[in-house]
Amino acid sequence: MYRSIIKPILFSLTIERAHRAVLILLRAIGLIPGGRWLLRKCYAVKHPALEREVFGIKFANPVGLAAGFDRNGEAFRELAALGFGFVEVGTVTPRPQAGNPRPRVFRLPKDEAIINRIGLSNRGLEKTIQHLRRPHEGFIVGCNAAADYLKLFRNLYQYADYFTVNISCDNSCREGATHTREHILRILDPLFDFRRGQNQYRPIMLKVSPDMPDAVIDEISDILLETPLDGIVATNGTHNREGLHTSRTTLDKIGSGRLSGAPLTQRAVEVVRRIHTRSGGNFPIIGVGGIMTPDDAKAMLDAGADLLQLYTGYIYNGPGLVRDICRALVADAEAKAAEEKAAAAQATAEQPAVQQAAAEQTAKEQPAPQSAETQPEAENAEPAPAESRTPAQSGPDSEQPES
């Protein structure tokens, strides 16, 4: 239904108008009695195999929605009903920001990608708090912050379940800026200090760019080992335009911006795998970038991600993508459980045969008992020299060497 009816309608609009229409529709559904229940009935998948506990937080499933879709926290409860295990709102700034001039978001249908230079367009801290005050027990809401990190952290601390520090955002630091260890710690240390004085613990994640050199990725991974940082979100969009099917003329006309979607899949998985390997698999990773299919999701998890986030794949494939990923993960878990059960059953079935074979082997190794008629003769016989005596020559009453 999404691909045949809804997607053509949405794709006939500019991407920002389509996005706004979806948020308005979701909020309207949420106001209808039973509206969110109907969404859950159609799209949500619940299964114990999907449940995760990451940085001390329990997630109903590992599939989340990346920052940028619900920038102001307007529809996170309706998005939860669509099957997401968590939603990251933002990017949030202290004051409302209009962002960059339009047009600023572009679809690349031939590549299943989007180019975005929207900037930090959001309605500001106060409006976000107003939305996050709505009850959301049992559902995880993260908050993505760029610039003025400490102010946002303090004001949103009681409303969000975790925080993402978005150092990869071009709007909080100049494009191509080098993210040295000192630069990152200047951002993080005040947040750690504030958190130490609170009664509740809020995990802090660091979001990285796929365009960072591997050496910088390694240095950021090492920060996990040296600080109270809880994990990494990998990755943001890329400025790379290599290998696209969209014409160079079209790309030049669009201009600058971060590319997300299918062209990012391979690099995002590489970055996640590198961080996982470098950190010894001991720290949480949220994998995001180019997850367009259930197979992409499984590849990201296999690379070391603990949780996933969707964005562009959700736009191109619709709400059924979350359901399809969750179903695929459940099917894999059930298949693995069935294999383990079959292996255990086979081992149990083979156990009597193994025990019988062992008993027979033991019996063969036992010395043959001597008959009563031969015992006296054996007792009167000259004992064989110790070095040449064999088990066959030793009767049950023969003296055995100490073991």
Go through the PLM ranges and name each one:
Residues 96-112, 242-255, 313-337:
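C-terminal helical cap(s) of enzyme catalytic domains, especially alpha/beta-barrels
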Residues 36-45, 170-183, 223-281:
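Glycine/Thr-rich beta-alpha phosphate-binding loop at enzyme active sites
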Residues 1-141, 146, 325:
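N-terminal capping/small domains of soluble enzymes
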Residues 145-151, 177, 205-226:
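Active-site glycine- and acidic-residue-rich loops that bind
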Residues 58-64, 137-143, 197-212, 277-287:
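Short beta-strand/loop segments at the ligand-binding rim of alpha/beta enzyme cores
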Residues 113-116, 122-138, 180-201, 253-283, ...:
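Alpha-helix-loop-beta-strand connector modules within alpha/beta enzyme cores
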Residues 74-79, 212-226, 281, 291-308:
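Catalytic cores of alpha/beta
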Residues 88-94, 167-169, 231-239, 291, ...:
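Glycine-rich phosphate-binding active-site loops on the catalytic face of alpha/beta enzymes
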